[in-house]
Design a protein with these regions (language model features):
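Aromatic- and glycine-rich beta-strand/loop motifs that create alpha-glucan
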Residues: 1-25, 284
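Terminal transmembrane helical anchor/hairpin motif
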Residues: 41-46, 51, 187-270
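Long, hydrophobic alpha-helical segments
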Residues: 60-86
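Transmembrane helix boundary and interhelical loop/hinge segments in multi-pass membrane proteins
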Residues: 76-97, 110-111
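Junction motif at the cytosolic side of a transmembrane helix
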Residues: 248-304
Length: 304
């Protein structure tokens, strides 16, 4: 299987750059600071109690996991927002489109490069994360789920950045638009549910409310932490006792997490398709139509 040339080139350039070393160092430093601050907080809260302080160390896992997901979600759009618009600024976009690569290969190459870079950060943080498993006594399967969610966050953030980069000519504009789309997913997806609860009877509006939250990152991470740490569903607590078979099914087991993951993957794929469509060269049929219009305009001007 032939490796995507963009991935091969960009990963090599990033791996050899001093900037990458600095970014990994800063990332590790932030993770270490978060770990020690959380550790000091947990020990201070249990200093004057009879409980076992080590039983509370398990909460280091969600603290570090959420910190990393937030950093990845904030940093990746900055890198991917210049993937296409940066080529336009350097005036190399047309050269890139004349290569033998398809628009889809170009988009996937840029996205996979961003995901690979994110995984470098995640792998570099494993020693710090390992401390939470050793001290807190967690199963190592939690590490797998942490990496899986990190992959989802990276793909989702990268797809937003790539789509914005394909529409914008300036990288800074693409970054701003990317964070604007973030606000839509964080706030706008929760706002209809909140308004429904206020303006209507909560018991009658559960079905309408719950659908909006499938694409809310805060709800997704909260549900993941609740299932991981307490084996209880936060969504089930929101829904409460209901006679609706659909809502009971959503709140059972890991159904909500699975559906929400599928929804985020589908939206990410949609964003990538939009980006691919945006950078695709004009098709032959459209090119003929444009050529015909241009010839008509030239003829009219010459006759006029």
């Amino acid at each position: 299987m032939r490796l995507n040339p963009i991935i091969k080139k960009d990963v090599k350039v990033q791996a050899r750059s001093f900037k990458m070393c600095v970014e990994v160092f800063v990332y590790e430093l932030i993770m270490a600071l978060v770990f020690f601050v959380a550790l000091l907080y947990i020990t201070s809260q249990n200093r004057f109690t009879d409980g076992n302080v080590y039983s509370q160390m398990v909460w280091l896992y969600p603290v570090l996991a959420i910190a990393q997901w937030v950093i990845l979600g904030a940093v990746i759009p900055i890198h991917t927002s210049s993937a296409i618009s940066g080529e336009k600024e350097r005036q190399t976009f047309d050269i890139m489109m004349t290569t033998g690569m398809t628009p889809w290969s170009i988009i996937m190459g840029k996205v996979m490069t961003a995901v690979a870079q994110a995984m470098i950060f995640v792998v570099a943080s494993i020693p710090v994360m390992a401390l939470t498993f050793v001290v807190g006594g967690l199963s190592w399967s939690y590490l797998f789920w942490f990496i899986a969610v990190a992959l989802l966050v990276s793909l989702f953030a990268a797809s937003i950045g790539i789509m914005c980069s394909s529409f914008c000519r300036k990288s800074i504009t693409a970054v701003i638009v990317s964070y604007g789309i973030y606000i839509i997913f964080f706030v706008v997806t929760a706002l209809p549910a909140y308004l429904i609860c206020i303006l209507t009877d909560y018991a009658k509006s559960e079905k309408d409310m719950i659908g909006f939250l499938l694409l809310n990152p805060v709800v997704y991470i909260t549900e993941f932490v609740a299932k991981s740490m307490t084996d209880a569903s936060w969504i089930a607590d929101i829904i409460g006792q209901t006679k609706s078979p659909l809502l009971n099914w959503l709140a059972s087991g890991s159904v909500w997490m699975i559906l929400s993951t599928i929804a985020f993957l589908a939206v990410s794929f949609l964003f990538l398709l939009i980006a691919k469509k945006r950078i695709s060269p004009v098709s032959k049929r459209k090119a003929k139509k444009l050529a015909g219009k241009q010839m008509t305009q030239i003829t009219e001007q010459s006759n006029g």
